[in-house]
């Protein structure tokens, strides 16, 4: 597990004189964040605390110490034990949280994280990639990623981020309604995109996606629905009806198919995330 952690923020080297006060008082790491202390010189005392500030355990760390990660949300504080102290702190997270923590992007779609556990690195098209939350993660895992979106600002952000992270992602401005994928891919991803497409173009778009997926390859679609029991609360240009997406892919093998309630990141007038029904499908081409 710890081998899967990646550093998203490294603090400067601190001495006894500039060790931040907040770290010398009771504090904890965020959800999904592990702390990695490194003592370069001198001695540092580390206190494990309860939420009330009671000491559970004390440790003295030196450059020779094998210092374990500070677990997420674990209460602790530190204290300089020598005048020559030099230490630093790195913040670590799982790969799926890396870009959201480092760049404050929207979290990677959970179905993409799940799909990556069963689909080995391959040639991927992220169709309607937005700022690249899914593309960046898949590239980090070693997939050969192509990312298309119609929004210039989103593609510009993705290009800037991939350069900073030294990731090889091919990007382009693209109107999905054109249904003009020309190369073949092993995995085509489209999460929360179909609701912005032209209704009359959807059959052509899906046909084009299916035709340009290699045999044995996968399509992952997460899309808004509107059904009699749960009408879509927002005026999207397209929503799937009950079993409509399933019907489009009836000649493929379904690894996952469900039509469940979900939430948008968008909130209503009371600040609550908008709830609606989504079709989620991971299918393999026979």
Curated annotation (Swiss-Prot):
Taxonomic superkingdom: Bacteria
Q: Does the keyword Nucleus apply?
A: no
Q: Which UniProt keywords apply?
A: Methyltransferase, S-adenosyl-L-methionine, Transferase
Per its UniProt entry, what is the enzyme's top EC class, as one word?
A: transferase
Q: Is S-adenosyl-L-methionine found in the keyword set?
A: yes
Q: Which GO terms describe its molecular function?
A: methyltransferase activity; S-adenosylmethionine-dependent methyltransferase activity
Xref: NCBIfam families: PRK11207.1 (NF008405), PRK12335.1 (NF008992), tehB (TIGR00477)
Tell me what this protein is called.
Probable S-adenosyl-L-methionine-dependent methyltransferase TehB
Membrane spanning stretches: none
What Enzyme Commission number(s) appear in the record?
A: 2.1.1.-
Q: What induces it?
A: Transcription is significantly up-regulated during growth in iron/heme-restricted conditions.
| Family as reported in the entry's similarity comment | Belongs to the TehB family.
Residue positions annotated to bind S-adenosyl-L-methionine are 128, 133, 149, 175-176, 191
Q: Which GO terms describe its biological process?
A: methylation; response to tellurium ion
